[in-house]
């Protein structure tokens, strides 16, 4: 999942029309560097303190012939990101990127690119544990709302708008339901989830006339801040102060009050450009990350978790029968799978979820999940897809066979006939043929 998130943000960065402005901030250059493939990073570092162009042939000496494909991928990425400039023979490092990246590494300049820490002590003690708890509660409020947890809190208006705009939920405002894309979102690690929403936020910023480069600068700045340290609001631009209010709703930053002149980045923010994947301070402490689901051949499911979020997700495709302090027992049935399918969740997504969260005890099984269960879930999906709903109008109660046959022939000529039964003197047409058919029957009645 981490590779997917890196691919998405890199794709967005490649499409930016003006990279010169993006690379004017040291924090942005550092963040972009962290998002590059490993070999691309190596090439950047090898040229960083060398102002002279390097011949393409010289790079060939650094790698084995069998690794040529990786070199090509790295070069293409660096050129598309406008970090490398290639004239067909020599490669030069972007001068602005070089300058600002060196500043980021050496700590020089007076640019406030990495935020301005508050010098006075906060009267209200804010600890790392508090920030972790705040971020976890705020982010899981969004996830609980998506899966429809009973009595779940409503996220802010900005979050609701983004969930719908990004296709993660659909329906009227007071009846939003998770979509197939939304369930896929739940399968991602925490960092990929956050970047999914932030990329939608970046696209939305263009519609609201916010500068996407300034938005990126602020996100990259957050990724370079220190967890547990307070930073001043006064040095932020107008765009960044608007963003600060929005990002509070995602749990990326904490402010005691809206008018507070200081803010604290949470672990969700400081991990934006790293491989951070958990809401917990130590990833190893999260049992859910290790796998907690056991599935039997009789379709019974045992989930060793106390997480309300994971229990709610399982409830999307299984009937829960019993719940204990750290164990939930359920069963996967035709009705529970059909319910999930009706919500837009695919069979493959359910199987992926069960595989991803399989208990270590199941890891020795080959295949990991019972084949009978996997096959049955796919069969239930095929059963649903075999039935197709077509909106239209049913015509019936014809007095004679000839009148019925002539009406059916007319519907066929129009190309709107869906179904007919001469035995019952009934036929069904699409809505597009309703008006012509009604007019035809009226003409017949006049005769």
From Swiss-Prot:
It is found in: Nucleus. It comes from the Eukaryota. One of its GO terms (cellular component) is transcription factor TFIIH core complex. Coiled coil: none annotated. Its main location: nucleus. GO terms for biological process: nucleotide-excision repair; transcription initiation at RNA polymerase II promoter. Keywords: DNA damage, DNA repair, Nucleus, Transcription, Transcription regulation. One of its GO terms (molecular function) is double-stranded DNA binding. The keyword Nucleus applies. Component of the general transcription and DNA repair factor IIH (TFIIH) core complex, which is involved in general and transcription-coupled nucleotide excision repair (NER) of damaged DNA and, when complexed to TFIIK, in RNA transcription by RNA polymerase II. In NER, TFIIH acts by opening DNA around the lesion to allow the excision of the damaged oligonucleotide and its replacement by a new DNA fragment. In transcription, TFIIH has an essential role in transcription initiation. NCBIfam families: tfb2. Component of the 7-subunit TFIIH core complex composed of XPB/ptr8, XPD/rad15, ssl1, tfb1, tfb2, tfb4 and tfb5, which is active in NER. The core complex associates with the 3-subunit CTD-kinase module TFIIK composed of mcs2/cyclin H, mcs6/cdk7 and pmh1/tfb3 to form the 10-subunit holoenzyme (holo-TFIIH) active in transcription. Belongs to the TFB2 family. This is General transcription and DNA repair factor IIH subunit tfb2. It comes from Schizosaccharomyces pombe (strain 972 / ATCC 24843).
């Amino acid at each position: 999942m981490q590779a997917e998130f890196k691919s998405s943000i890199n794709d967005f960065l490649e499409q930016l029309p003006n990279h010169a402005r993006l690379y004017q901030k040291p924090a942005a250059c550092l963040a972009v560097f962290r998002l590059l493939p490993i070999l691309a990073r190596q090439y950047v570092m090898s040229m960083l303190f060398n102002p002279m162009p390097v011949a393409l042939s010289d790079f060939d000496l650094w790698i084995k012939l069998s690794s040529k494909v990786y070199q090509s991928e790295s070069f293409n990425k660096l050129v598309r990101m406008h970090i490398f400039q290639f004239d067909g023979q020599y490669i030069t490092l972007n001068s602005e990127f070089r300058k600002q990246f060196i500043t980021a590494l050496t700590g020089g300049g007076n640019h406030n690119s990495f935020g301005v820490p508050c010098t006075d002590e906060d009267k209200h003690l804010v600890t790392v544990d508090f920030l972790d708890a705040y971020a976890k509660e705020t982010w899981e409020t969004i996830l609980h709302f998506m899966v429809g947890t009973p009595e779940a809190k409503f996220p802010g208006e900005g979050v609701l708008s983004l969930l719908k705009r990004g296709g993660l939920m659909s329906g009227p405002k007071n009846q939003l339901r998770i979509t197939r894309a939304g369930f896929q979102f739940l399968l991602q690690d925490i960092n990929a989830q956050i970047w999914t929403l932030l990329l939608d936020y970046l696209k939305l910023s263009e519609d609201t006339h916010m500068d996407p480069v300034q938005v990126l600068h602020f996100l990259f700045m957050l990724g370079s801040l220190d967890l547990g340290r307070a930073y001043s609001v006064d040095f932020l631009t107008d765009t960044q102060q608007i963003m600060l209010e929005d990002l509070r709703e995602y749990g990326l930053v904490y402010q005691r009050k809206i008018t507070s002149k200081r803010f604290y980045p949470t672990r969700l923010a400081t991990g934006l450009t790293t491989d951070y994947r958990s809401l917990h301070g130590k990833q190893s402490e999260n049992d859910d990350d290790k796998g907690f689901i056991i599935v039997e051949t009789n379709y019974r499911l045992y989930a060793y978790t106390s997480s309300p979020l994971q229990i709610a997700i399982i409830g999307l495709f299984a009937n829960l029968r019993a719940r204990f302090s750290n164990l939930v027992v359920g069963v996967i049935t035709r009705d529970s799978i059909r319910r999930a399918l009706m919500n837009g969740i695919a069979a493959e997504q359910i199987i992926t979820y069960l595989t991803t969260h399989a208990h270590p005890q199941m890891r020795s099984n080959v295949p990991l999940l019972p084949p009978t269960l996997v096959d049955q879930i796919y069969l239930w999906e095929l059963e649903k897809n075999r039935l197709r709903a077509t909106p239209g109008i049913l015509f019936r109660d014809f007095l004679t066979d000839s009148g019925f046959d002539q009406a059916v022939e007319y519907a066929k000529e129009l190309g709107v006939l869906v179904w007919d039964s001469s035995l019952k003197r009934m036929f069904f047409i699409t809505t597009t043929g309703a008006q012509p058919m009604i007019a035809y029957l009226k003409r017949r009645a006049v005769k």
